[in-house]
Design a protein with these regions (language model features):
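Short, surface-exposed linear segments at secondary-structure transitions and domain or protein termini
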Residues: 79-82, 112-120, 137-142, 212-214
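An acidic-aromatic
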Residues: 98-131
Length: 235
């Protein structure tokens, strides 16, 4: 789901816990650790991103000005959404420029678990219904990708005015011998010939357990000077 990434260049939900092994490692274990990992748990990583409590800040410099976005993900339990019982998580995105708060946005992601299926997203002026076109794999090979979701965004729950339609694609690329970048790429608004918001790519560095090790957001959008990209990452 697109969360608040376009509105606030945020909306990531990261698991704060990273499991680490300690102690001695025998020779067989050491040999195994040097082998490149080629498969990663996509579903577990996405559950950590969207359904687990978290609090994190990403940073960027836009036209020489320091910008930071803090986002907090708060699981809220079970609710009714679009006629079905689902799980939901609230996302609060707070944007600061030069350390001064300029915007605070609240959105809610809706999904079901076991298996993970995305259902939609709401904010003050959006009511979004997701149609998942492909299942989320338990495991995937590095280099894999899938366009898995189409989302229709309405101005309110009455669904009388369709204001946005976009697709989402996940991709998995190698980051190191034992980690990978899982990116969620949102298309432009398919209802517009030229979308001023452009595209958003939310990327998460994951390990073999699906823990979130790092994150970043890239927002590419058209301007008078051509395509521009704003990059947000951990400080």
């Amino acid at each position: 789901m697109k969360t608040l990434a376009v509105a606030a260049i945020a909306g990531l939900g990261l698991s704060a816990c990273v499991s680490m092994n300690s102690g001695s490692m025998n020779q067989n274990d050491a040999s195994k650790s040097n082998q490149a990992v080629t498969q990663f748990p996509i579903e577990t990583a996405l559950v950590n991103i969207y359904a687990k409590a978290s609090d994190e800040t990403l940073y960027s410099t836009v036209e020489g000005i320091a910008v930071e976005v803090n986002f907090e993900t708060i699981p809220k339990g079970t609710v009714m959404f679009n006629g079905q019982r689902v799980q939901n998580s609230e996302v609060v995105a707070t944007t600061k420029i030069l350390s001064e708060i300029i915007d605070k946005s609240v959105g809610v992601n809706y999904y079901t678990l076991d298996p993970l299926v995305f259902r939609g997203f709401t904010s003050d002026d959006e009511y979004s219904i997701a149609t998942q076109m492909a299942s989320i794999p338990k495991m995937a090979d590095v280099g894999s990708s899938s366009t898995y979701l189409t989302e229709n965004v309405y101005s309110d729950s009455g669904k009388r005015s369709l204001i946005n339609r976009y697709t989402q694609t996940w991709t998995l690329a190698s980051a190191s011998s034992n980690s990978a970048w899982l990116c969620i790429n949102s298309s432009t608004n398919l209802l517009l010939a030229d979308d001023p918001d452009g595209t958003v790519s939310e990327c998460y560095k994951i390990n073999q357990q699906g823990d979130i090790l790092d994150s970043k957001i890239d927002n590419s959008y058209p301007s008078d000077e051509g395509m521009m990209t704003i990059n947000f990452n951990r400080g």
